[in-house]
């Protein structure tokens, strides 16, 4: 949590937990204070002239006189927590990652169950995704129907990606597996160029489709979608699938209506096999929200940040109050 004036504070993820041994010192000080107070009380009871004692001493000494000591102990507790090095989760933009946006442009994407049609709505949401994605991420674009084509190699230039999205054209058949394999090849190519470390940059495939794979007919074939998803899993590239459309979509072929219901099941299995996550959307608004959620997941990474400063500030503030209280209540610093 983050508190005003103090900053982030946490009670987890300690980097130097051995500093908690200092709590034994704090406990010792508490015990010493109690012993001193009891001894002080005994000395007062041995006062020779009890009548004089009752006349000069308050009948019930104020408990406020213990406040400075309590505050000092609390400040030591706060300082001990700070020295133990607590951490908290910090989200920072990624600047070394690759995302391949793979869009289905088969004929079923001209269905009008999503206004004005599936492809146009997908184009609008995809361009929003490109705009929202953090600037340091390399974004590429692949369109697939019967074959897959890399329209934009992974780049931080969002304008080129959006221009290519606007130019998407419908084609026959649906080769989802080829679209995934093409994305994996593009990721491997750019990863070798921008590696910048011992490991390749983190990568993700975002697959948007509305229907079942038709080429090949069996998704478990060597070039099928399920085989491609397993390959993505082996390469450490999760696939986020977005199934887009409704069960009532249709297209007209030779003046006859051909049902093209969305196939959520296949896309979910692709995501599961790859270690990714499946999303569904049946309207443009839902699709935009899905891409916003994806941007939040992909565009940022969570790291451990220091959360000790807040405890140091709290300890210093409480210690100052202890000193002030000692001067006002006891007219001296607590001992």
Curated annotation (Swiss-Prot):
Residues 98-294 form the VWFA domain. The chain crosses the membrane at residues 18-38, 67-87, 309-329. PROSITE patterns: VWFA. Keywords: Cell membrane, Membrane, Transmembrane, Transmembrane helix. One of its GO terms (cellular component) is plasma membrane. It is found in: Cell membrane. Its main location: membrane. Pfam families: BatA (PF07584), VWA_2 (PF13519). It is a multi-pass membrane protein. Belongs to the UPF0353 family. This is UPF0353 protein Mflv_3659.
């Amino acid at each position: 949590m983050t508190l005003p004036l103090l900053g982030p504070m946490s009670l987890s993820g300690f980097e130097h937990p051995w500093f908690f041994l200092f709590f034994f010192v704090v406990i010792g000080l508490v015990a010493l204070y109690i012993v001193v107070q009891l001894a002080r009380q005994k000395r007062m009871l041995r006062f020779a002239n009890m009548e004089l004692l009752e006349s000069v001493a308050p009948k019930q000494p104020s408990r406020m006189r213990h406040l400075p000591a309590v505050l000092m102990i609390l400040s030591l507790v706060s300082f001990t927590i700070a020295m133990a090095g607590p951490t908290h989760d910090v989200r920072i933009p990624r600047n070394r990652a690759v995302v391949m946006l793979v869009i289905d442009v088969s004929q079923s994407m001209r269905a009008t169950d999503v206004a004005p049609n599936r492809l146009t709505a997908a184009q609008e949401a995809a361009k929003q995704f490109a705009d929202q994605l953090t600037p340091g991420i390399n974004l590429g674009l692949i369109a697939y129907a019967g074959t897959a084509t890399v329209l934009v190699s992974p780049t931080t230039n969002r304008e080129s990606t959006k221009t290519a999205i606007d130019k998407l054209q419908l084609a026959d058949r649906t080769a989802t597996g080829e679209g995934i394999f093409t994305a994996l090849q593009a990721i491997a190519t750019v990863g070798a160029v921008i590696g910048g470390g011992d490991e390749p940059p983190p990568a993700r495939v975002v697959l948007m489709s509305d229907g079942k794979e038709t080429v090949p007919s069996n998704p478990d074939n060597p070039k099928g979608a399920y085989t491609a998803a397993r390959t993505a899993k082996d390469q450490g590239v999760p696939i986020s699938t977005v199934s887009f459309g409704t069960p009532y979509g249709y297209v007209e072929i030779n003046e006859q209506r051909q049902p093209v219901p969305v196939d959520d099941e296949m896309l979910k299995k692709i995501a599961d096999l790859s270690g990714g996550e499946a999303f569904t959307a049946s309207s443009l608004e839902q699709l935009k929200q899905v891409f916003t959620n994806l941007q939040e997941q992909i565009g940022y990474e969570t790291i451990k940040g220091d959360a000790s400063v807040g405890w140091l500030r709290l300890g210093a503030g409480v210690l100052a109050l202890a000193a002030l209280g000692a001067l006002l209540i006891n007219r001296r610093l607590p001992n």
